Amino acid sequence: MGLFEEPRYVIKNTCNHFYEMPENTIREQTFCCGSGSGLNAGENMELRLRGGLPRANSVKYVHEKHGVNMVACVCAIDRAALPTALDYWVPGMAVTGVHELVGNALILEGEKPRETNLRGEPLPGMEEEEDV
């Protein structure tokens, strides 16, 4: 049922640090983001936030325990819906797709390391240091 290990392999080989959410919230026991079946619309916000609370709690756990600042998803609906839910439940948590994570990590020969992601947003950890 589904692809569980392949995305983890890609993520572990793309980012600096990888932490799993609690075991009872991942793989076959995962929680939905709460926005499937057309619920990713503004008028359904309260229902989306309630439905996404279990996922938000597991993200909050790794954020507080390990300082995780980004969650990567293979699901396009999660990628579209989680930023709003996590801004509410876990402020400051970034959301990316696995393909975005890989694209942002790729540095081709002769290319300088990126300071912004492919969307033009600052990459976490690559912000310019202010002059002291």
Predicted regions and their residues:
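Iron-sulfur cluster-binding electron-transfer modules in prokaryotic oxidoreductases
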Residues: M1-V132
